[in-house]
Amino acid sequence: MFGRLMPREGKFFELFDQHADQIAIGSVELVGLMNQYADTNARQRHIEAIDAIEKAADRYTHETVALLHQTFITPFDRESIHQLITQMDDILDLIQDVAESAMLYDLQRITNEAQQLADINQMCCERVKAAVNLLSSMENANQILKICAEIDRLESDADRVMRSAMSRLFRDETDVRQLIKLKAIYELLEEVSDKCDDVANTIEGVVLENA
């Protein structure tokens, strides 16, 4: 009984950190997939790696939710904890969606814009990891808020690349099937950065409420 009343902040932050590690690793694999897409063996390795990373992250998500139900005193409000871990999980779900869609659609090529979006996503994910790693101490508040602002800027960069990519796609692509496939991949890639920005907004809210 008393165990349920004791704060277990450390375990929550440990799970956040472990999940954030998987996000960063997954984003590296996504860049590898986009850059080495023409190599069938490398492509398959990256897809399999992303699938394994997503499964590992799912375990951390489920463990966090279970801990939330078992713990009476939490490091910050329960709704924000659930929102944060769910949004973090969404990032890797989308990275996996990109990998699976590329395979399912049997894309003939990956464009420079898709590679640029993957690069931006990696930078976003690295900053998500950095912000999450600092979240256990509100002494890091200013640094966390700075990182969140960087994620917001990168998300705007992704929007600009997306607009340019779509413009060129509809202007230059003559194969309708290829156009539809690439459009879907672009949208998934952009959504990764959107989800990173959602995480940044949630973290920013936690910091402003608790600093």
Stretches found by the model and what they are:
Residues M1-A211:
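Cytosolic, long alpha-helical scaffolding segments
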